[in-house]
């Protein structure tokens, strides 16, 4: 099935033939749906701290970050902005020349409100000897869009989201990359330093480095901080093979195998190389201007405080279990912590012998830990917090995407639809064990939680294998705590017109 040429191509990517055969088998057989106990809710898997508790956790975080621990802000930023402009690309090829759809009208009616307006105007003058207003008056709407999206203009159709101008300020507009630098200074710093790591695509790496080089010093001075900015790319070894509809390997026109990026779950390899005590994770496009950053900063400190508080308890319990000297009451206390604080429940725990119980508790405590902010469901697309069964029969908190739900199971579909909260990708993670060693994060992935999607290339249908999502199956075997955070902390930009929302103005 695989030729000598195929094997060479496979090894050049850092993949083994066995991995390719396993992926083809997964594409053919699909993935099992997860067994779900319930959608998480407040009091059943989601912790909603009150004002006093929030202050306590902020204080815990302030104390922890002042003790010299290494904190890193990890930002997945490889996404191209092309999807943001899908509607405008459609306008460019439409058989009409004036804004017709509601989206097109909203864009042009409010074009002066965008942070990129001055740069766009300059490009229009350079290419068409007219400003945006004049081109609109002349009915040359498509020229305006071309100057925004195409290489002759600002090239926003090809740039990464992280480098587009999002927000207006008196001292000039800011990109999401800059907003993340500011956030790092405000909640993810320690000892006068802020470490921030962007995962970027190979094509955009130099652009990011250039922009950071231009901007970092300004924010260092403004916030009296030193930034350590690093970058990594998604590894080719995490790409997955594409298949034809009959499950045979899909081949390019030159006969080579087609490999595709395996989705954001591949970033576990990048995260695994981060040496830090605490890692904040948030998507590149979920940023707001300074005037409403306070609530984001507050709740980042809250969830970080909850993390370091829970981690300290877990470490203390592990050290106690290591001594071999503990009382029945202490074991009961550890069981309560594992079941109530970490949400790991084993229905037949009382049937375990003493030695088995200690092994079980050690196993459940000694793993990476994450606190996930979740927001009230307002109909935004995305995954949600659930309580799910694991292979060992235990139940634990998991973030599920709709693709992981069995659509033929009416009860599960109802749980997903009626879920009170959803996942805005607001995580803070602890990736070291109680002896100070880094966990090997790929060991904690549930490999049975990927999914198959239908795509096409050059008009030919294909099956694509998506790895378990970074905050889904890839962190399946982590200890997970869900915490309710305000909806105001979630302001993603999925289309260019989202920048017109009040939060981004």
Where are these regions (language model features)?
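OB-fold and OB-like single-stranded nucleic-acid-recognition modules
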Residues: 291-292, 312, 316, 326-505
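Domain-scale recognition of functional cores that engage charged ligands
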Residues: 8-10, 29-32, 36-378, 387-388, ...
């Amino acid at each position: 099935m695989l030729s000598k040429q195929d094997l060479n191509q496979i090894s050049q990517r850092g993949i083994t033939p066995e991995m390719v055969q396993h992926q083809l088998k997964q594409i053919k057989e699909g993935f099992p749906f997860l067994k779900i106990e319930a959608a998480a809710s407040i009091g059943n898997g989601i912790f909603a701290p009150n004002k006093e508790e929030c202050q306590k956790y902020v204080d815990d975080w302030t104390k922890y970050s002042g003790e010299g621990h290494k904190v890193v802000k990890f930002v997945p930023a490889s996404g191209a902005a092309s999807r943001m402009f899908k509607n405008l690309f459609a306008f460019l090829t439409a058989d009409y020349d004036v804004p017709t759809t509601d989206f097109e009208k909203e864009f042009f009616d409010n074009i002066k409100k965008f942070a990129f307006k001055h740069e766009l105007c300059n490009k229009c003058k350079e290419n068409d000897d007219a400003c945006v207003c004049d081109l609109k008056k002349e009915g040359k709407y498509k020229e305006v869009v071309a100057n925004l999206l195409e290489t002759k203009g600002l090239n926003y159709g090809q740039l990464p989201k992280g480098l587009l101008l999002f927000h207006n300020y008196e001292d000039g507009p800011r990109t999401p990359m800059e907003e993340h630098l500011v956030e790092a200074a405000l909640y993810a710093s320690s000892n006068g330093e802020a470490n921030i790591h962007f995962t970027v695509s190979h094509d955009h790496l130099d652009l990011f480095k250039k922009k950071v080089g231009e901007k970092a010093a300004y924010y260092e001075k403004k916030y009296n901080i030193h930034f350590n900015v690093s970058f990594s790319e998604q590894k080719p070894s995490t790409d997955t093979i594409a298949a034809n509809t009959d499950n045979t390997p899909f081949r390019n026109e030159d006969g080579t195998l087609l490999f595709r990026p395996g989705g954001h779950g591949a970033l576990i390899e990048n995260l695994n190389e981060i040496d830090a005590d605490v890692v904040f994770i948030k998507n590149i496009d979920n940023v707001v201007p300074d005037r409403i950053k306070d609530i984001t900063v507050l709740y980042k400190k809250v969830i970080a405080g909850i993390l370091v508080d829970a981690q300290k308890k877990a470490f203390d319990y592990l050290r106690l279990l290591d001594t071999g000297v503990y009382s029945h009451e202490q074991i009961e206390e550890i069981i309560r912590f594992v079941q109530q604080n970490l949400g790991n429940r084993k229905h037949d725990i009382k049937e375990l012998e003493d030695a088995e119980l200690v092994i079980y508790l050690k196993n459940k405590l000694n793993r990476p830990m994450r606190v996930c902010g979740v927001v009230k469901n307002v109909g935004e697309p995305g995954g949600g917090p659930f309580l799910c069964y694991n292979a060992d029969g235990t139940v634990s908190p998991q973030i599920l995407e709709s693709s992981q739900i069995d659509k033929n199971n009416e009860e599960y579909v109802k749980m997903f639809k009626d879920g009170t909260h959803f996942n805005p990708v607001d995580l803070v993670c602890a990736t070291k064990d109680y002896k100070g060693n880094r966990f090997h994060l790929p060991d904690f992935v549930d490999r049975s939680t990927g999914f198959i999607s239908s795509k096409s290339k050059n008009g030919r249908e294909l099956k694509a294998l998506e790895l378990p999502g970074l905050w889904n199956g890839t962190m399946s075997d982590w200890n997970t705590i869900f915490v309710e955070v305000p909806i105001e902390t979630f302001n993603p930009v999925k289309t260019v017109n989202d920048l017109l929302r009040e939060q981004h103005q």
